[in-house]
Amino acid sequence: MKTIMLCAISSLSAGNCSEDCHYCTQSAGTKADIKRYKLKSPEQVVDEAKKAYANHALGFCLVTSGARLDDQKTEQVACIARAVGKEVPQLMLIACNGMASYDQLKELKNAGVFSYNHNLETSRDFFPKICTTHSWDERWQTNLDAKATGLQLCCGGIYGIGESKTDRASFRTSLKELAPFSSPINFFIANPALKIKTPRLSVDEALKIVDDTVLALPNARIMIAGGREAVLGERQYEIFDHGVSAVVIGDYLTTKGEESCKDIAKFKQMGFEFASKCH
């Protein structure tokens, strides 16, 4: 029987980011209609983790808004990771907290984090056109430091933000060099508050992106994340015919996802089992 890995997201904090990433509704200066809040309590996140596990999630991603970790935020995320690990030890903890130093990443690993998610987002050449407050090279270095600590790497990006086919190929070459454990694919969803005004990707183009990513990263778990429902619509479950082996269930950081119960029922109908441990 075929197996897929399900991942759920806990947005520990939201909004008020200092960075100007043009594709993100949490970025500086945007007036997007999103929830903005400071750090959730460990108890609140543990409750979310229990619900995620009940919905067959293996991965549980602890996400904070903002450009990077500082020592205080590192300890806060580590505290939450320890609390979740104690109450729901079956979950594979993923941290997604922006740019970080080797020592900060090591602290997260020691707190029970299995994998660090820090997306390159796009090619090195195109990145300055969609973000000016930090560099692609800083993102690259964080990924190298995460690998150096022994954390598994979760690294991918976003498509449909105005990048060329050459940018996509260059981006995938960089991912191939990093050799991540898992690689999320996000499809851009337009928002009136954002600077990017590109048309939505077609379903066929989105699936071609999936094909090219699977080909470039044969040893990685290819995960479809943001934009799955909006871009792929009724054809969203075709992703599994194109080599995808992981999906995000439930809501994303600032956009609604498919209802978990609907996804799970469909996955079962398709004959999938749910991964219960990492390989």
Swiss-Prot record:
Pathway: Cofactor biosynthesis; biotin biosynthesis; biotin from 7,8-diaminononanoate: step 2/2. Keywords: 2Fe-2S, 4Fe-4S, Biotin biosynthesis, Iron, Iron-sulfur, Metal-binding, S-adenosyl-L-methionine, Transferase. The keyword Metal-binding applies. Binds 1 [4Fe-4S] cluster. The cluster is coordinated with 3 cysteines and an exchangeable S-adenosyl-L-methionine. Its cofactor is [4Fe-4S] cluster; [2Fe-2S] cluster. InterPro entries: Aldolase_TIM, BATS_dom, Biotin_synth/BioAB, Biotin_synthase, Elp3/MiaA/NifB-like_rSAM, rSAM. It comes from the Bacteria. [4Fe-4S] cluster binds at C17, C21, C24. Residues 2-228 form the Radical SAM core domain. The keyword Hydrolase does not apply. Its EC number is 2.8.1.6. [2Fe-2S] cluster binds at C61, C96, C154, R221. GO terms for biological process: biotin biosynthetic process. It catalyses: (4R,5S)-dethiobiotin + (sulfur carrier)-SH + 2 reduced [2Fe-2S]-[ferredoxin] + 2 S-adenosyl-L-methionine = (sulfur carrier)-H + biotin + 2 5'-deoxyadenosine + 2 L-methionine + 2 oxidized [2Fe-2S]-[ferredoxin]. One of its GO terms (molecular function) is 2 iron, 2 sulfur cluster binding. Catalyzes the conversion of dethiobiotin (DTB) to biotin by the insertion of a sulfur atom into dethiobiotin via a radical-based mechanism. Homodimer. Belongs to the radical SAM superfamily. Biotin synthase family. HAMAP family: BioB. This is Biotin synthase. It comes from Campylobacter curvus (strain 525.92). The gene is bioB.
